[in-house]
């Protein structure tokens, strides 16, 4: 029997959904425990969330096979975000409005606009990979090491950070929002 024709595949989808929901829920509970002053309990929620994430990844890989390249994952993510803002949240908002839940309908619409921005961001990042612009900018840029904060000006970041020895992959273009 092929996995695609089996009840086991349905069980894998259910297990993946359950584990990802638990991962999210325990992450929320961790934040609340921290806020309430229970650091040890927060750490246990964090550890359990990490475990649930590992379980989710296990089931996900059975469902989809190997996780794709970063470029493939960006394309997949952009498609997911497009569906969410063009279809899913619009339908959810309509349904909520029909049932008299105006506030929830409005929240669905606001989240849809965020999902649209996510799609645009994923598409731009994919384009950066395709055009070789992730670690190169014509005319130069200010690059910051995400590990230690070292700042480098140039068309590309250094191959190795001269301060902390992390690889080029840890550099990003400096963004100032202050």
Question: For each of these PLM feature ranges, what is it?
Answer:
Residues 1-178:
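Non-heme di-metal
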């Amino acid at each position: 029997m092929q996995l695609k024709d089996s009840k086991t595949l349905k069980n894998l989808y259910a297990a993946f959904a359950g584990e990802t929901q638990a991962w999210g829920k325990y992450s929320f509970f961790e934040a609340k425990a921290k806020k309430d002053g229970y650091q040890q309990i927060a750490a246990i929620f964090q550890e359990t969330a990490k475990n649930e994430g590992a379980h989710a990844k296990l089931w996900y890989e059975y469902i989809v096979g190997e996780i794709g390249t970063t470029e493939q994952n960006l394309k997949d993510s952009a498609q997911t975000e497009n569906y969410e803002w063009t279809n899913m949240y619009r339908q959810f908002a309509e349904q909520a409005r029909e049932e008299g839940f105006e506030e929830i309908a409005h929240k669905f619409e606001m989240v849809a606009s965020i999902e649209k921005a996510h799609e645009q961001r994923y598409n731009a990042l994919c384009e950066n990979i395709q055009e070789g612009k992730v670690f190169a900018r014509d005319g130069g840029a200010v690059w910051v090491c995400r590990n230690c904060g070292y700042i480098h000006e140039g068309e590309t970041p250094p191959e190795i950070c001269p301060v902390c020895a992390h690889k080029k992959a840890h550099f990003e273009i400096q963004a100032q929002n202050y």
